[in-house]
């Protein structure tokens, strides 16, 4: 049977499948046609995300049905050592008491003209975890 896969760009892909095909198989066919790796594909039908191990019949996908292809967003956790480095970089600053400019940790005077290059600086407050 024939089904359609619509991408977010509006492009429609036509696939030849069987109702016994798994979602994995469909994703592999999409990869063959479009070059998108299966682990980056999310298929949506009737508002539901389709799970890899299940078949088209499980979701009652029939001939000429339209699936929607969405790309998976990759993001996630920052490694703890990088998180500590970012925290150190963002918190070890001096703040001008007049114009609130952020300055490097060893600053003696503000770099801004509007406060007259003030020497009234304080350390940036530490945020609590």
Swiss-Prot record:
GO cellular component, one term: ribonucleoprotein complex
Family annotation (PROSITE patterns): UBIQUITIN_1, UBIQUITIN_2
InterPro entries linked to this entry: Ribosomal_eL40_dom (IPR001975), Ribosomal_eL40_sf (IPR038587), Ubiquitin-like_dom (IPR000626), Ubiquitin-like_domsf (IPR029071), Ubiquitin_CS (IPR019954), Ubiquitin_dom (IPR019956), Ubiquitin_ubiquitin-like (IPR050158)
Gene3D superfamilies given in the database record: 4.10.1060.50, Phosphatidylinositol 3-kinase Catalytic Subunit, Chain A, domain 1
Keywords: Cytoplasm, Isopeptide bond, Nucleus, Ribonucleoprotein, Ribosomal protein, Ubl conjugation
Cross-linked residues, Glycyl lysine isopeptide (Gly-Lys) (interchain with K-? in acceptor proteins): 76
Residues annotated as domain Ubiquitin-like: 1-76
Gene Ontology biological process: modification-dependent protein catabolic process; protein ubiquitination; translation
Additional comment: Ubiquitin is generally synthesized as a polyubiquitin precursor with tandem head to tail repeats. Often, there are one to three additional amino acids after the last repeat, removed in the mature protein. Alternatively, ubiquitin extension protein is synthesized as a single copy of ubiquitin fused to a ribosomal protein (either eL40 or eS31) or to an ubiquitin-related protein (either RUB1 or RUB2). Following translation, extension protein is cleaved from ubiquitin.
Family: In the N-terminal section; belongs to the ubiquitin family. In the C-terminal section; belongs to the eukaryotic ribosomal protein eL40 family.
Name of the protein: Ubiquitin-ribosomal protein eL40z fusion protein
Organism: Oryza sativa subsp. japonica
Lineage, opening ranks: Eukaryota, Viridiplantae, Streptophyta, Embryophyta, Tracheophyta
Gene name, Swiss-Prot/TrEMBL: Ub-CEP52-1
């Amino acid at each position: 049977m024939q089904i359609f896969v619509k991408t977010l760009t509006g492009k429609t892909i036509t696939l030849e499948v069987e109702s016994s095909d798994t979602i994995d198989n469909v994703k592999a066919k999409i990869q063959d046609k479009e070059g998108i790796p299966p682990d980056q594909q999310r298929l949506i039908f009737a508002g539901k995300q389709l799970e890899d191990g299940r078949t088209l019949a499980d979701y009652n996908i029939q001939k000429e049905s339209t699936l929607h292809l969405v790309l998976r967003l990759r993001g996630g956790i920052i490694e703890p050592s990088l998180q500590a480095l970012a925290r150190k970089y963002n918190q070890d600053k001096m703040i001008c008491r007049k114009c609130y400019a952020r300055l490097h940790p060893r600053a003696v005077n503000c770099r801004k003209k509007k406060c007259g290059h003030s020497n009234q600086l304080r350390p940036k407050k530490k945020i609590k975890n």
